[in-house]
């Protein structure tokens, strides 16, 4: 979602004179915040998920489905309960926020989940209730799906139907995407679209490889002449699905998990340890094979979002000699991270890092250590796109808005999140960002709990998963390929090694040994389930952690169901949503094996998806035979026992 500041947003031309000021003061804000809170210690594990939903409307008479652009109307109703609860002092069950599309909403639990193992048993129940609450506000021909809509940009894909206007600068001159498909209830989203185009010097160009079926033309070249002149579609490539608007990426739905660390050192350590895991979860959660009504040759939204917000100038993309720009920048501002940030991980930073020398010096002079200073200075090679006229001058001791406007628009696979200055209850956090959103609440809960259990296992066993950061970049590319779970190999640590420089051991760089070369290519199955006489598998390590914990019967059952499900998906016995979707399309009687996924197919696909997500139709190919024992509440006895255990362990730690 990003930073939702109130005010009057500046255009790109209006922003440019303020860029250096905003960067300088953004860094000052970070330095002040860091030193004020760097000694904060003892925060409990709290965590939460963010799920984005698409609202769709079925036209049964014509067998067509469209996105329903009513997010603002829904949010007004959903957020009214939050306002009432605030007045009454009542806890919220969930929170609702806008997303990029006018057909999208984002839901989170009303309060973070706590450190109790029993909390894993209430996650799915909360997700189910969220979906039910939204559906009660919809009409009979509408539904709420946790998917990326496959026909974005197809003529008439919105309800109400609005045509794209290539002459409309507010819609970034797209030939596919109407302004009304962007959420207009907050200026952030439209302004981001315009300012990315303004900085880049042209509209974004997204080209996704087409899936070559038996009847797909070769080369595949679309006739887009009816949509505009040659200049309007000049960036289209043969054998690719062409798109030209931020909405094709940011209009996809995602699943993210944020968790709080005990202190800043643990947050930085977890950021690094989880980074090599991100491509594995991207492949394991693959869910997005269709773009603009065409079957693509990739299974993930990741590179599509990356291209949709790529604001680099031609010089920064290496297309023209450097003249007005400072650097050639290898990646979009939405991509995988280029550096580890924990002091003893720096030996694995093998990618040349572009960073702002002036910003870096300001950070070093402000007593920020080198690894963190380089990470922040690297983020600050990007310019701010969200500047509000009323918020240019700020108190750098009390605000972090200038820092966050750049930090929150560096969309990487991991995000290191300092505490907000105005929320003393929130500590140092890490956000895990690559996972594709799943069709059902069971799947989404399984992935969220799996990631959080990974963090608990990592902290408990202090094993290291680090590899050269360039290998993570390579793995992210492999993870998006069609059927990556079945066909790709991923670079990964082949043996277990204890991290000698874990936060509680770190006294200085003397603990940091040379980078390990103990890396080999493994399948997703081998990484998740283990390899004979080799890596034991992430699930095996999680089970060992759980064996040392006191877990109630229902929670243990639920966690076991989630882990068994993840295990079977890793083997390929259970399909990824992307694989299942391809199979549905290719076996549909209306499919002509030409890569075109027409209205009739999409209608039947989403009808089937709705039935599965509602529990009306159980699909074993997609879900297996697993059921959790999720509940809305933790029993008082279990809560009391686990809280006593946590207090006892904290006393032993001190």
UniProtKB/Swiss-Prot annotation:
It holds the Pfam family GCS. One of its GO terms (molecular function) is ATP binding. It is an enzyme of class 6 (ligase). Keywords: ATP-binding, Glutathione biosynthesis, Ligase, Nucleotide-binding, Stress response. Transmembrane segments: none annotated. One of its GO terms (biological process) is response to arsenic-containing substance. InterPro entries: GCS, Gln_synth/guanido_kin_cat_dom. GO terms for cellular component: glutamate-cysteine ligase complex. Pathway: Sulfur metabolism; glutathione biosynthesis; glutathione from L-cysteine and L-glutamate: step 1/2. It catalyses: L-cysteine + L-glutamate + ATP = gamma-L-glutamyl-L-cysteine + ADP + phosphate + H(+). Disruption phenotype: RNAi-mediated knockdown of gsr-1 in mutants lacking trxr-1 causes an arrest during larval molting characterized by a partial detachment of the old cuticle and an impaired ability to reduce cuticle components. Also results in growth arrest during the postdauer molt. RNAi-mediated knockdown causes a severe loss of viability upon arsenite treatment. Its EC number is 6.3.2.2. Expressed in intestine upon arsenite treatment. Induction: By oxidative stress such as arsenite treatment. It comes from the Eukaryota. Plays a role in resistance to arsenite. May play a role in the oxidative stress response induced by reactive oxygen species produced during infection by pathogenic bacteria. Together with trxr-1, required for the reduction of disulfide groups in the cuticle during molting. Belongs to the glutamate--cysteine ligase type 3 family. This is Glutamate--cysteine ligase. The lineage of its organism: Eukaryota, Metazoa, Ecdysozoa, Nematoda, Chromadorea.
């Amino acid at each position: 979602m990003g930073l939702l500041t109130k005010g009057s947003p500046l255009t790109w031309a209006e922003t440019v004179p303020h860029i250096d000021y905003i960067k300088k003061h953004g860094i000052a804000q970070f330095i002040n915040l860091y030193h004020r809170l760097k000694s904060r210690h003892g925060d409990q594990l709290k965590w939460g998920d963010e799920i984005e939903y698409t609202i769709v409307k079925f036209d049964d008479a014509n067998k067509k489905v469209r996105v329903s652009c009513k997010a603002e109307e829904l949010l007004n109703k959903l957020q009214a309960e939050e306002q009432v609860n605030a007045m009454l002092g009542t806890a919220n069950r969930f929170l609702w926020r806008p997303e990029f599309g006018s057909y999208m909403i984002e839901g989170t639990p009303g309060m973070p989940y706590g450190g109790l193992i029993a909390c894993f048993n209430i996650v799915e129940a909360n997700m189910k209730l969220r979906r039910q609450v939204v559906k009660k506000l919809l009409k009979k021909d509408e539904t709420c799906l946790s998917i990326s809509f496959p026909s974005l940009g197809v003529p008439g894909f919105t309800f109400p139907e609005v045509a794209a206007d290539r002459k409309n600068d507010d819609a970034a001159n797209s030939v596919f995407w109407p302004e009304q498909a962007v959420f207009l209830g907050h200026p952030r989203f439209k302004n981001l679209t315009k300012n990315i185009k303004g900085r880049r010097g042209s509209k974004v160009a997204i080209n996704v490889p087409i899936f070559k079926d038996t009847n797909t033309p070769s080369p595949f070249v679309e006739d887009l002449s009816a949509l505009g002149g040659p200049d309007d579609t000049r960036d289209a490539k043969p054998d690719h699905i062409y798109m030209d608007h931020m909405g094709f990426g940011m209009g996809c739905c995602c699943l993210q998990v944020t968790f709080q660390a005990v202190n800043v050192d643990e947050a930085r350590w977890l950021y690094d340890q989880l980074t090599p895991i991100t491509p594995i979860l991207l492949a394991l959660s693959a869910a997005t094979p269709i773009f603009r009504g065409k079957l693509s040759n990739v299974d993930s939204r990741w590179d599509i979002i990356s291209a949709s917000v790529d604001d680099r100038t031609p010089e920064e993309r290496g297309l023209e000699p450097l003249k007005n720009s400072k650097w050639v920048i290898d990646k979009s501002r939405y991509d995988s991270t280029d550096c580890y940030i924990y002091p003893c991980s720096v030996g694995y930073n093998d990618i040349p890092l572009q960073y702002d020398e002036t910003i870096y010096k300001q950070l070093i002079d402000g007593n920020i250590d080198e690894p963190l200073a380089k990470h922040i200075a690297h983020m600050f090679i990007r310019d701010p796109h969200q500047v509000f006229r009323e918020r240019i001058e700020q108190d750098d001791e009390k605000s972090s808005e200038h820092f966050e406007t750049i930090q929150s628009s560096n969309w990487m696979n991991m995000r290191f999140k300092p505490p907000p200055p105005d929320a003393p209850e929130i500590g140092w956090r890490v956000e895990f960002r690559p996972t594709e959103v799943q069709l059902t609440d069971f799947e989404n809960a399984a992935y969220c709990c799996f990631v959080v259990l990974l963090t608990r296992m990592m902290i408990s066993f202090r094993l290291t998963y680090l590899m050269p950061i360039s290998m993570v970049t390579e793995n992210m590319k492999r993870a998006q390929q069609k059927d990556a779970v079945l066909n790709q190999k991923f670079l990964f640590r082949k043996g277990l090694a204890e991290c000698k420089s874990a936060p509680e051991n770190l006294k200085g760089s003397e603990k940091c040994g040379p980078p390990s070369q103990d890396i080999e290519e493994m399948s997703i199955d081998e990484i998740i389930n283990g390899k004979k006489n080799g890596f034991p598998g992430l699930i095996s390590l999680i089970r060992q952690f759980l064996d040392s914990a006191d877990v109630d019967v229902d929670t243990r059952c639920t966690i076991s169901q989630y882990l068994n499900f993840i295990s079977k998906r890793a083997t390929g016995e259970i399909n990824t949503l992307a694989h299942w979707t391809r199979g549905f399309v290719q076996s549909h009687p209306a499919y002509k094996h030409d890569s075109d996924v027409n209205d009739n197919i999409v209608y039947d696909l989403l009808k089937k998806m709705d039935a599965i997500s509602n529990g009306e139709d159980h699909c074993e190919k997609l879900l297996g035979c697993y059921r959790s024992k999720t509940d809305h509440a933790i029993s008082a006895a279990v809560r009391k026992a686990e809280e006593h255990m946590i207090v006892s362990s904290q006393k032993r730690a001190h």
